[in-house]
């Protein structure tokens, strides 16, 4: 039997203009309670490169770069059953309420 896993709360504030959506956190992200925590995931390296920042593993610095650049992150799936981290293994998913999030944060201009 597969365990049911849940997404993190959105990282967003009133100044957020861009919303980046993932599927649902993988095993490593769930363990660390951090978005995109697996070292092989390129998300953070791309963000640092995009904004000409020196790469760091420090999660608070990573989150501050998103905030400084008005970027929000969340997942399209609120909860699901999944063995491992592969999206192809997702079963019985329930969607996050993205429409409600966008209504609450009208400054979002791009997803």
Descriptions of predicted regions:
Residues 2-110:
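A polyanion-binding, active-site-adjacent surface
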């Amino acid at each position: 039997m597969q365990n049911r896993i849940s997404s993190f709360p959105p990282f967003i504030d009133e100044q957020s203009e861009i919303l980046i959506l993932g599927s649902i956190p993988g095993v490593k992200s769930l363990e660390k309670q951090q978005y995109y925590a697996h070292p092989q995931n390129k998300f953070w390296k791309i963000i640092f490169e995009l904004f000409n920042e020196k790469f760091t593993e420090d999660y608070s610095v990573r989150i501050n770069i998103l905030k400084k650049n008005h970027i929000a992150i969340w997942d399209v799936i609120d909860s699901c059953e999944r063995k491992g981290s592969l999206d192809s293994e997702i079963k019985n998913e329930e969607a996050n309420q993205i429409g409600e999030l966008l209504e609450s944060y009208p400054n979002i201009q791009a997803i």
